Structure formats: structure tokens, C-alpha cells
């Protein structure tokens, strides 16, 4: 038991000696005072807040090192037009250029090259165009006449039907009038025939009575 206590005390003394030696002799060790200490070189954070605007970087197109690359600027240049890999001649060409467009827009007339035509399509270019147009005109006129004839026939038939219906109606009304007149005439004849018979019967009854007897004369 005593041996353990002595060993513990020896270790504790050795540890304290080591700590004291480090704190007194080694100045480069970590110290909390160094972290808290404020020096003149350290400035506040808000003093360093500054805004910097960077100039936008402009990207330039790389140089066209190869002549076969596609470039939109080449489409606007008439001098670099190619035909089957060969450059067209600048003068004496027979193509359609911007000059022709300027002439058309400016009010001038397009003047094509010799032997190439103006690109316009006329009636003389196609010999069958006149025949087709004439056939279409005849067909249109014939169809119009047929429609007019059909309309006239249908209107005439409807008119005749209406006329026939009205004639039947008038005939029926006239027949009814005749029947009414005939009935009235028969009634009048019956009345005329009945009155004389009544008078005759009255006279006949009077004549049938015997005459009164005369009294005897003295």
C-alpha cells in the first residue's frame, strides 16, 4: 500500500515539473491570450467590406484557320460563293445576286442574263393551258344553265300544283252554293203547293155541308 502511494506521488511530481517547464521555457506554444489579444494590424470586419465590379470578359471568336469551316458571314458575301469547290468569278457571272434584288425593290425591272429567261411563267409556255381554261369555262357555263333550267321547271311544277289546289277549292265552294240554292228552291215550291191545298180543302168542306131547310110557308 505504501509502495503504491509513493509511486503515485512520484508520477504526479514528474507531471507538474513537465508542465512548469513547458509554460516557462517554450514561448511558441498555444496560448489563449494570443487569440484574445487585439493588435493594431487586425481591423474590424465591417471596415473590409467593399464591393468590386469586375469588367465583363468579352469572348472573341477564334480565328478561322481552315477555309472549309462554316461561317454565317460568308452567306452575305457574294465574292466567296463557290460552285463544286471552285470559286465563282466575280465579274461576268450569270447568277442571281443582291444587285438584282435591289433593282426589283427599287422599282426597276429584273433583267435576266441572256439565254436564261426572266423566270416568269406565261400562257405560251404550256400549250395545253389554253385548252384547259376553255374547257373549264364551258363546264361552268353548262352547269349554270342546267341549274337555271332545273329551277325553272321546279317552280313551274309548284305553280301548277297550287293552281290545281285552288281550282278544286273553288269548285267545291261553287258546288256547295248550288246545292244550297237548290234546297232553297225546293222549300219554296213546297210552301207554294201547300197553301192552295189548304184553301181548297176549306172550300170543299164548306160546299159539302147541306143547305139549311126553308120553313114552310103558310
From Swiss-Prot:
Compositionally biased residues, Basic and acidic residues: 76-87, 110-119
Pfam family, one: CD99L2
Topology term for the membrane: Single-pass type I membrane protein
UniProt keyword Coiled coil present: no
Single biological process term from Gene Ontology: cell adhesion
Chief location category: membrane
Domain of life assignment: Eukaryota
Compartments, record wording: Cell membrane; Cell junction; Secreted
Alphabetized InterPro entries for the sequence: CD99L2
PANTHER family assigned to the protein according to its UniProt record, in alphabetical order: CD99 ANTIGEN-LIKE PROTEIN 2 (PTHR15076:SF12), CD99/MIC2 PROTEIN RELATED (PTHR15076)
Function: Plays a role in a late step of leukocyte extravasation helping cells to overcome the endothelial basement membrane. Acts at the same site as, but independently of, PECAM1. Homophilic adhesion molecule, but these interactions may not be required for cell aggregation.
Protein name listed in UniProt: CD99 antigen-like protein 2
Organism annotation: Pongo abelii
